[in-house]
Regions:
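Nucleotidyltransferase catalytic core that binds NTPs
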Residues: 1-163
């Protein structure tokens, strides 16, 4: 019987990628026993202003940070998928790459406003929502619309909060 591969998805503008991203990725690999994490860099974040770094600079910085880390891979899918929306990227990974066991990783700051994301209910049906601590957001995140909707289905990782 074929082993079911467990994939973590950490998406965003990565403006820029930093050691905090690497730290939570390593924690997720260990705690969730993930086979791989994809850092899915998007050209633009619909909730943020224009990025400080160019897309090519952000990809380069991310690749430098994960150098010598075998289980983390940097990818850019906006052009292939035709969108930077998380739901479109997840659907692409499921349909085209045949991925099934996906852990969608966000910070507790994003959990607070996750109900504003496009097709968020579909996104949480297709993945295992995994939430990392962010300073000042954990309590708000646990009381959020999405947390109430999912009840006990969110995986909370109690890491040392990243600022």
């Amino acid at each position: 019987m074929k082993k079911k591969i467990k994939i973590g998805i950490l998406g965003g503008s990565f403006d820029p990628a930093h050691k905090g991203h690497l730290k939570i990725s390593k924690i997720a690999i260990k705690k969730l026993k993930l086979d791989k994490i994809l850092w899915v860099i998007t050209n633009k974040n619909p909730f943020k202003k224009k990025p400080f770094y160019s897309l090519s600079e952000r990809i380069l910085i991310a690749k430098k940070i994960i150098k010598n880390t075998k289980k983390i891979q940097v990818t850019y899918l906006d052009k292939i998928v035709g969108s930077s929306r998380s739901i479109k990227i997840i659907e692409h990974l499921i349909i085209k790459k045949k991925l099934k066991n996906i852990y969608f990783m966000i910070g507790s700051d994003n959990l607070v406003t996750f109900h504003k994301w496009k097709s968020w209910k579909k996104l949480v049906k297709l993945t295992k929502l995994t939430v990392f601590s962010r300073s000042g957001y954990d309590k708000k995140g646990k009381k959020s619309i999405v947390a109430k909707y999912l009840k006990n289905k969110i995986i909370f990782i109690n890491n040392k909060p990243i600022l």
